[in-house]
Amino acid sequence: MTTETRDQGMPAFYAQAPSISLRDPLAQFLGAAQDGVMEYRYADAVRLAGHSCPTVAGAWLMTLHGLRALYGSDMPVRGEVEVLMRDARDSGVTGVIASVAQLITGAAPETGFQGIGSAHRFARNNLLVFGAGSLQGVLGLRRKDTGQAVQVRLDGSVVPWPDEMKALMPKAISGQASAAELARFAELWQDRVRKMVVEHAADTSMVQVSDLKVA
């Protein structure tokens, strides 16, 4: 099955969003991927969340840009990055953002994989932390090997909803929209996502990365 076949039925622009390849030592150890290298695409995040929205798109871009800041031209190592969420796990869209970050980085909360053997090799648990209130951004990423860390902030106002949404969204949410209005609502919804992950994917005014000092 090709990527095109697998993503059939999804908006075509998903394939235009930036993807990321990581090396996963656990996948290599257990023979799940050649050399442990795996590529993640925006469609994978959509499958995980069950939907595509500005939050999922923002989480995707924040994690990608955070990893690029940490690793530069080197390939990021999955399972070797801690994810710090500023807010509590049940606060707003924090859980959605954390799920996307976990998909990409492999970082899991206390319920995650505890590792292999007495040395707990390749453990992923306790790498995803909530309530790190000192963050200036939405999330932070820290390399386990070097300790280098960054914080990432998203400014969604860079890509606002069109004026047409002001009337459509309340009708769609309340169940009062017609079939034609619902189709238009979905079209406008995904168009904002498209602008984020395609047109503004490298926009540093939307996704802002800065150094983070972790005690």
Q: Where does each model-flagged region fall?
A:
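Non-transmembrane, aqueous-exposed alpha-helical and coiled segments at domain scale
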Residues: 1-52, 61-215
